[in-house]
Amino acid sequence: MTDTTTNRVVSLKALLEAGVHFGHQTKRWNPKMRPFIFTDRNGIHIIDLQQTVTSLQSAYRFVADAVAGGGKVLFVGTKKQAQEAVRDEATRSNQLYVTQRWMGGLLTNFSTIKRRLQFLHDLEARRDRGEFNLVTKAEALKLEDEIVKLNRVFGGIKTMERLPAAMFVIDPHKETLAISEAKKLGIPVVAMVDTNCDPDPIDYPIPSNDDAIRAIRLMAGKIADAALEGQNRRQSQHIEERALAEQTKYEEDAF
């Protein structure tokens, strides 16, 4: 696995340093991951990083295009070692995230979730207007506790006004419910797939160690970079369209 490919998304050196190539024990593998496995060493499967590079490039292009088209990406990583990276990278790229337990119906029953989000927004607005000062101290504390509780569950999706254009998952083996909801709604799924995963339900599988914190942060960071690229493209397009509209208006007014 020599680094013969120059590519702007990620290098083999970066993947190696993050431990992306380390899979699970050979006895814990999913045979469907065979095409993504390079070899095994001391009872551990070693992921083919050339395929990781290619897969990540495809996922990167897809995410950038989805965001450039006005969509949002929902990052999902509820296991402990994924939570911080998922929260940080989704926030950095102005995307959505879930790091606590996946709430059933979050996507498939989004109308109900939207009502809960509106309730949270209303509570925070009341607090910001000073309305909590107009109720008893006990009632104010109860309302503050409700805000904290709702933010713990919904904090990463507070700005979600419609269904996401894509989902990025850290560990499909753990996030089966989230993936199931996305598939029912036709939402494309990008995911890190370790050697114990089933890649079949994933639209853009990225073969990778999904347990090592450095590997998770690297991949989440690249998907966040793709989202930022998409945002920049969208903003540039809006600027060009606005300039064209102003030029057209100027020419019309001149006649």
UniProtKB/Swiss-Prot annotation:
Q: Which InterPro entries match?
A: Ribosomal_uS2, Ribosomal_uS2_bac/mit/plastid, Ribosomal_uS2_CS, Ribosomal_uS2_flav_dom_sf
SUPFAM superfamilies referenced in this protein's UniProt entry, alphabetically: Ribosomal protein S2
Family (UniProt) = Belongs to the universal ribosomal protein uS2 family.
Q: Which GO terms describe its cellular component?
A: cytosolic small ribosomal subunit
Q: Gene name, please? A: rpsB
Spell out the molecular function terms from Gene Ontology. Answer: structural constituent of ribosome
NCBIfam families, A to Z: rpsB_bact (TIGR01011)
What is the designated name of this protein?
Small ribosomal subunit protein uS2
Q: Which organism is it from?
A: Herpetosiphon aurantiacus (strain ATCC 23779 / DSM 785 / 114-95)
Q: Which Pfam families match?
A: Ribosomal_S2
| Disulfide bond annotation, renumbered to this chain | none
Q: Which GO terms describe its biological process?
A: translation
Q: Which UniProt keywords apply?
A: Ribonucleoprotein, Ribosomal protein
> Which PROSITE patterns does the annotation name?
RIBOSOMAL_S2_1, RIBOSOMAL_S2_2
